[in-house]
């Protein structure tokens, strides 16, 4: 995190207004403005582990990563600055949670890119903190209101589920493919053969559908699942539990918290971070897999066909094969050999 996002640049146009404010930053925190903003006090709350990693280097205990915000995260803050994400249900979940903890009378600012749908903040908060647009620049909108009424928030009411091939998939707002199995994951699942054995790592596990499907027909696998998203981690745990399956699930920025080696690594890696296209996670996944695969172990990933993964795979492993494809997606398979660049 270094250069400021357009949303942060819009906020900086109003920096003089915040000098006496005790601010809680939340939402899609794509830069380190919360650590550098001049104000009376600054805290941050995030559901994204990689955002927590970046901010905690400068903010220490004043930034927290978790599924839901707690009263201690709000502490004595009198102002919320919320960065609007591209996912509206995610925004609603986070705002209802945070505003249920903020004291009535708190200042509420919402900022985001127009293309992210930040305009939806006005109707969403109309009953709690009626918003007015106070600035428009850098293709972003900045909105302000005062909290008039705290919303009621209950985590249980936000859970949803769907069924696929006899499996119950538990989901939360902000989890990839929350409303059903995406086409890419479906293609990857079609390549997983029954009676797979050994240690399997599911990177970017989302709601845990890949691992649950694999374990349902390969009961001898030992599952490890990880994701940067707190809702995804909790959803995966719930999915495994709902289907009587076992596995270790934890938050990790690709391999940052992963220890040991595996016989198979599976993933449908993201190529967006917030509104921005980013291949960082996929590149880290491919290059880091060398250090986490046993000899003869396999990396199997699905990706949009237009993404330049073959080049990265060949640079890292010396080869790749496409084992399934449609017009939009390809499933790549690589077997760990001595030639791979460690």
From Swiss-Prot:
InterPro entries, A to Z: DNA_methylase_N6_adenine_CS, Mtase_sm_N, rRNA_ssu_MeTfrase_C, RsmC/RlmG, SAM-dependent_MTases_sf, Small_mtfrase_dom
Domain of life, per lineage: Bacteria
SUPFAM superfamilies according to UniProt: S-adenosyl-L-methionine-dependent methyltransferases
Reaction(s) this enzyme catalyzes, per UniProt: guanosine(1207) in 16S rRNA + S-adenosyl-L-methionine = N(2)-methylguanosine(1207) in 16S rRNA + S-adenosyl-L-homocysteine + H(+)
Gene Ontology CC annotations of this record: cytoplasm
Membership in a protein family: Belongs to the methyltransferase superfamily. RsmC family.
Protein name per its UniProtKB record: Ribosomal RNA small subunit methyltransferase C
Organism: Salmonella typhi
Lineage of producing organism: Bacteria, Pseudomonadati, Pseudomonadota, Gammaproteobacteria, Enterobacterales
């Amino acid at each position: 995190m270094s250069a400021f996002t357009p949303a942060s640049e819009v906020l900086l146009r109003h920096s003089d207004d915040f000098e006496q404010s005790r601010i809680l930053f939340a939402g899609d925190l794509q830069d380190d403005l919360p650590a550098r903003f001049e104000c009376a006090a600054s805290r941050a709350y995030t559901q994204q582990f990689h955002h927590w990693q970046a901010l905690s280097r400068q903010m220490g205990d004043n930034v927290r990563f978790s599924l839901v915000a707690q009263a201690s995260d709000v502490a004595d803050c009198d102002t919320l600055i919320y960065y609007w994400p591209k996912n509206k249900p995610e925004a609603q979940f986070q705002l209802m949670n945070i505003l249920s903890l903020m004291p009535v009378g708190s200042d509420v600012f919402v900022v985001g890119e127009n293309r992210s749908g930040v305009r939806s903040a006005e109707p969403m908060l109309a009953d709690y903190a009626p918003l007015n647009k106070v600035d428009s620049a850098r293709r972003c909108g900045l909105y302000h209101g005062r909290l008039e009424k705290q919303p009621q928030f209950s985590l249980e009411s936000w859970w949803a589920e769907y069924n696929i091939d006899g499996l119950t998939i538990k989901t939360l707002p902000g989890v990839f493919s929350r409303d059903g199995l995406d086409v890419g994951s479906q293609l990857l699942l079609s390549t997983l053969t029954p009676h797979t054995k050994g240690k399997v790592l599911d990177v970017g596990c989302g709601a845990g559908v890949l691992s649950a499907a694999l374990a349902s027909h390969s009961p001898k696998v030992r599952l490890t699942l990880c994701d940067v998203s707190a809702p995804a981690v909790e959803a995966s745990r719930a999915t495994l539990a709902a289907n009587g399956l076992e596995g270790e699930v934890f938050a990790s920025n690709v391999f940052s918290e992963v220890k040991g080696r595996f016989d198979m690594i599976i993933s449908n890696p993201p190529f967006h971070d917030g509104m921005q296209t980013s291949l960082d996670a996929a590149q880290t996944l491919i290059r880091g897999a060398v250090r986490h695969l046993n000899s003869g172990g396999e990396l199997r990933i699905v990706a949009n066909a237009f993404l330049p993964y073959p080049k990265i795979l060949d640079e890292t492993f010396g080869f790749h094969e496409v084992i399934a494809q449609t017009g939009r997606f390809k499933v790549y398979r690589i077997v760990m050999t001595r030639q791979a660049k460690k």
